[in-house]
Amino acid sequence: METIGIVLNVGTDSVEAFERGFREHELPIWEDFQGRGVLLMATLTKLDISTKPAKGAVQYLVSVVFAGPEGHHLHDADPRFNAWNQIADQYQVGDGMAFGGATLLSVGV
């Protein structure tokens, strides 16, 4: 398993458009990858707690657990993701943060 965590800083004036776009563009990719056994679990979370808040932004945590490291590469090479990523970049204020690696322990997945 490989776990990826991304924190996005979405401008307060773009929250509705971002959430709508995420449902329209990214959610179908997750469903496709889960159906193919590539993705085990994924969540989009609006953060209430952050040690690094961004002024003028609502922060979101994207958490994805792939069956293996190839899932992350398949996702990032998917043309649907690349199209959504260009749209989503317009909603962000400031840099996001991305983390990932081999999952060491897991409960429930």
Can you say where each PLM-predicted feature lies in the sequence?
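A generic alpha-helix surface/boundary motif
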Residues: 1-2, 24
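Short amphipathic alpha-helical segments
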Residues: 14-44, 82-85
